From Swiss-Prot:
The active site is at C12. Keywords: Oxidoreductase. It catalyses: L-methionyl-[protein] + [thioredoxin]-disulfide + H2O = L-methionyl-(S)-S-oxide-[protein] + [thioredoxin]-dithiol; [thioredoxin]-disulfide + L-methionine + H2O = L-methionine (S)-S-oxide + [thioredoxin]-dithiol. Has an important function as a repair enzyme for proteins that have been inactivated by oxidation. Catalyzes the reversible oxidation-reduction of methionine sulfoxide in proteins to methionine. One of its GO terms (molecular function) is peptide-methionine (S)-S-oxide reductase activity. Its EC number is 1.8.4.11. InterPro entries: Met_Sox_Rdtase_MsrA_dom, Met_Sox_Rdtase_MsrA_sf. This is Peptide methionine sulfoxide reductase MsrA. One of its GO terms (biological process) is protein modification process. Belongs to the MsrA Met sulfoxide reductase family.
Length: 175
């Protein structure tokens, strides 16, 4: 079994773990920070907006069971790709939506998927602003952030209630 990785940023990383964690072929979903200029940042540093990092998830998967293309589709269903300034109640550059790609194959898949989403008209005239960027070093978040939806389901539910679930239902309910 040869495993691969994918990195996605879509707002609060707490809300990005559970949607991927439930699929066959997903070996691990890790919360962390990427895209910035500070090595080994802390949560507090990232939240301060001074590191350039965004909260993200690193997904380790078996491409024989789930494809990178499938992961990109799951990603779109978890984010507001028309909002470059954060996601839902989480605002700021550290919550920006990004698909981090590690090679030309991932880039082609992500760009094709983004173009198809734009052309679908699902979001009306709104532009799909999620960026596709080269992968940067990924720094795992502190242990208390890992698998947060399992550790603190009540607090996780409050985070999910901040507009994400309503958005998903509005735009993806029948899909």
């Amino acid at each position: 079994m040869s495993l691969d990785t994918a990195i996605f940023a879509g707002g609060c990383f707490w809300c990005m773990v559970q949607p991927f964690d439930t699929y066959p072929g997903i070996e691990k979903v890790e919360s962390g920070y990427t895209g910035g200029h500070v090595a080994n940042p802390t949560y507090e540093q990232v939240c301060s907006g001074t590191t350039g990092h965004t909260e993200a998830v690193k997904i380790t998967f078996d491409p024989d069971k789930i494809s990178y293309k499938d992961l990109v589709e799951i990603y779109w269903h978890q984010t507001d790709p028309t909002d470059a300034s954060g996601q839902f109640q989480d605002r700021g550059d550290n919550y920006r939506p990004v698909i981090f790609v590690k090679n030309d194959e991932q880039r082609k898949i992500a760009e094709k998927s983004k173009k198809a989403l734009q052309e679908s008209g699902r979001f009306g005239d709104a532009k799909i602003v999620t960026t596709i960027e080269d992968v940067q070093p990924f720094y795992p978040a502190e242990d208390y952030h890992q698998g947060f939806y399992k550790k603190d389901p009540q607090r996780f539910a409050l985070e999910e209630a901040g507009g994400r679930q309503q958005f998903i239902e509005k735009y993806w309910k029948n899909n």
